Amino acid sequence: MLDEHFCDCIGEFLETSFHCILYIRGVYPSCLFSKSIKYDIPVPISRSDLLTRYISNSIDSLKPHFLKDTIEKISLTILNKYDKPIEKFIFEISSLNNTTNNKNKNNNNNNNNSDDDETFNYYINIQKQNYTSNNNNNNNNNINNNNNKPNLLQLEASFKAYIIKILMTTDSFYSEQNFYKTQQSSSSSSSLKTSGGGDGNGFISNSDGVIHFNEIDNETYQQIKSNQKNKKEDNDDNNNGDKDLKFTIHVHTKPTTSNIGLNTNLSNVILNINPLESPRRTNTTINQITPVWISTTEKDSEIENSYIIPLNSNITDGKTTIRTFTEQSITK
């Protein structure tokens, strides 16, 4: 079992990371993200209620399985326009089995005080043992409580290091030029109104079913994409340009775990949250958007001719560690 507060911290971290990854890989135009402060640093967060709610619901649905310690790793996979995986951002979870044998030995040693004084000191020894036993129990309870509490400062420092590392893989999210462009895009977008071309709720889908954002109309969105294609600086800001990228979230369960309670008919240990299967009906409201879980195979999620890049940002509370790394296709 994992600590509940630790699971909440990890869930919030994954949400933030997913937004940052979608931004740096240009899955959606950068102007559709705004800056928010997280872990004392500015991070890009999507302004789409649909996408934000989708990611949030996806992570929330995993919390019971975090608590049961049945999840081995989570990966956000970037797909090209042919639905071929080209890059994965992987979060691998490993738990440390804490034992209390040493503490029990110390308790036993402390409780066996001066048993040779069987006559004259009998009553004194009884009082001494009771006092020592109670004292040791209180100390052990304090130690156990402290061990069960995640080190929040250490966690936040690890989160911050990871976020900065992936943001710096772009041509600098923190550069003055990009900061100006993002601020300018954010201020100009705020004056835009949703009009025709949406689904009645501000949701916009193009012909391939990819859901776009709720604060611009279809004509404005196409103009943004056209500008990104024609202007080199916008292509640089979104490295993948106009490639119609998509993403999926894969959840890998531990080898000893099957199904993890999401669907009793699943036989694979890899599950997939597919954002393209979110409801797109005109009467759908934001509150009805929930993750769609489907089964997938190892082959479907594999990247051919890939290489691994360790990010060397081990995130830990002292008992549970999250290793982070990326897997990239050699030929995209």
From Swiss-Prot:
GO molecular function, one term: DNA binding
Record Pfam families: HORMA
General function of this protein: Adapter protein able to interact with different proteins and involved in different biological processes.
Family named by the database record: Belongs to the MAD2 family.
InterPro entries, per the entry: HORMA_dom (IPR003511), HORMA_dom_sf (IPR036570), Mad2-like (IPR045091)
Keywords: Cell cycle, Cell division, DNA-binding, Mitosis, Nucleus
GO biological process: cell division
PANTHER family: MITOTIC SPINDLE ASSEMBLY CHECKPOINT PROTEIN MAD2 (PTHR11842), MITOTIC SPINDLE ASSEMBLY CHECKPOINT PROTEIN MAD2B (PTHR11842:SF10)
Predominant location: nucleus
Region (Disordered): 181-204, 225-244
Coiled coil: none
Protein's name according to its UniProt entry: Mitotic spindle assembly checkpoint protein MAD2B
GO cellular component: nucleus; zeta DNA polymerase complex
The keyword Cell cycle appears for this protein: yes
Subcellular location, record wording: Nucleus
Top-rank taxon, per record: Eukaryota
Keyword Nucleus attributed: yes
PROSITE patterns documented for this protein: HORMA
